[in-house]
C-alpha cells in the first residue's frame, strides 16, 4: 500500500517521561507505516530545554506560527524537585504557557467518548468542549492582607498624569484586598478564537459571566463578545446553522447540567479552570481529554490534556510493563493530521486522521483497554492490556480500515 503523502510539515514537539515513550510507539506503529510523515522536529524534553536555555520552546512556537499546525507531546513544567532531579540551570517556565503567549491562543478541551463509559450526568450524550480564557483576572492579581483600620482605594494614573480613583472599602479592622485586570485586546482575541472554533466544529457557542453584579468588569466581556459576534461572525454562524448564546454564568451552569452536550462552552479564566475539571471528571477520565490551542488568526496546536505520567515512567525505567493510556496523545496526532489535510486540501490525510480515531474507539468499544479504563467500563467484560498491546490492537483495526 502506498503511503499517504503530505505537502506541508507538521511542527512536531517531543516531550518528557512516559508520554515521550508513548510518542515513539505511536509514531512507529500507527503513523510511519501509513504516512510519508513530514515534520519539523523540536525536542521539548526537559534536558534539551535546559541545554538550549529554553530557546527550543520559543523556536517551536514560532514554527507553529509559520506552518499553522503542530502536535505536542506532554512536557514537564519544573518545580524545585525537578530542578534538583534534572540538575537544571534554572526553573524553566511552562512550555504550554510560552506557546500560548506566542500564539495568543485559547485552549479547547473535549472528552473522547466511548459506548462503555457513560458520563456521570446521565443526559450528556455528546462531548462538551471547554474554552478557557487563560489570561489575567485572579491569575494575574495583586493582593495583600490589610493589617487594620484604613481606606482601600482603586487608583488609575493615565499616561498624561491624570487620575481616576474610587474607594473600594473603609476597613474598620483587619481584612484582605485584591486587584485584578484584563485587556480588551485579550478578551477580543479570546472571543475570535471561540467563534472560529465553533465554526470549525459546527457547534453552538455558549458564554456566561456575571454582568448583573460586575457591571464594568464582566459586562466588558459580555459586550466585547457581542460586538465581535455582530460585526464578524453573525452571518457565518447563521450560514452554518449554529447559534451564539449568552447568559449569566449560574444559568449557564444549570443549562449545561440539563443539556445533552454537543456545544462549545467559553469560560472566563477562573470559571474555565474549575469547570474543565468538573466536565472531564464527569465524562470519565482526564486520560480521555483532547486539547487544542487555537489562535485568533487560525493557528492550531494539538496535544493531550494530561501530564507526563511520571509514576509509570519510573516503572518503565525499571523494565516493568506499564498500562499507560495513549488515547489523548493518539487524538492529538489525528487532530493535527485532519487539520493539516483540510488546510492543504489532502482528503487522504483527513481520512487517515478519521480512520486512526475510529480504530482507536473500535478497540475500546470491543473491550480492549488500558487498566485505568477497565474500572470505569460498564456492560462489557474488559481485557486489560499494556500500552504496547493496546497500540498493536489499534494498528490491526487501522490496517483493516485503510485496506
Give residue ranges: language-model regions:
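N-terminal alpha-helical transmembrane segments of multi-pass membrane transport
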Residues: 2-6, 18, 22-23, 28-53, ...
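Glycine-rich phosphate/diphosphate-binding loop of Rossmann-like nucleotide-binding domains
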Residues: 6-25, 154-247
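Flexible, glycine/charged-enriched surface loops at secondary-structure junctions
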Residues: 35-41, 201-209, 233-246, 341-353, ...
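N-terminal small/polar loop signature for handling phosphorylated ligands or for N-terminal nucleophile
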Residues: 46-60, 222-263
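N-terminal glycine-rich phosphate/adenylate-binding segment common to multiple enzyme folds
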Residues: 47-159, 163, 270, 274
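Glycine-rich phosphate/nucleotide-binding loop
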Residues: 256-355, 362-366
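Internal helix-turn-beta structural module
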Residues: 319-324, 342-403
